[in-house]
Amino acid sequence: FVYLYSVLTERYKNLTKEFFDIYGKEIRTETGSSTCLTVGSLDIGAGTSDVTICSYEYNELKPSQLKPTPIFWDSFDYAGDDMLRVLINNILLEGQDGILQKELSKLGLEASQIYSKLFDFFGADHNRLSFKDRMVRRDFNAQVSVPIMYYFLNLLSDGEQFREISYDEIFAKQSPSQVVIDAFNEKMGIDLKSIRWTFDSAVMCKHIEYAMDNLLEHIAVIMYAYKCDIVLLTGRPT
């Protein structure tokens, strides 16, 4: 409703009929016909993605008054945190685009050795992983992986195409704890502060599409089924 209010008052100068004629559709009612506008909204938060669809009708005698009718609302347990996990795993850690995997390969390690190092430090809990190791893994993700990916997402939002980024640039305001740095250096055999983190917008977009494609396909079907005239995307990941 805030969206409609701002658009009608700021852009259309309260010319409600013209706005509804452009974006809305005519429907039949008991008293004849009227023009309605169906607005779908997707709010991608950290933990859930919330979908709402609402139909609006206006009164020709009082065009400033809109009658909202909610017709669909639901939440999906896939959102920004899930996308962030995919980006960290596929861009920072492992795979064809994994920066750490590339750094380990420069040491002349075989694929099995690289996988073992990455799994021992970042993988799921296993019987060789001590409580201290689990805490270090958690702290590394919170103090290193997440800040780097947020930095990448900000570069993407700013329209940056390609950059190599130093440790000092990313952690200029707050550095990871020395315990985390020392544990990483010991386990990986790499100096964390010497790594050049390569930002590539094409790689970012590829993995964002991979992470969100399934969710967006399902939501697109819902929006189409309810014949949405306008679709709004909100939330930080958008």
List the model feature ranges, each with a label.
Residues 24-38, 123-142, 190-195, 199:
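Intrinsically disordered, low-complexity acidic Ser/Thr-rich regulatory segments
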Residues 228-238:
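Glycine-rich phosphate-binding loops at beta-strand->alpha-helix junctions
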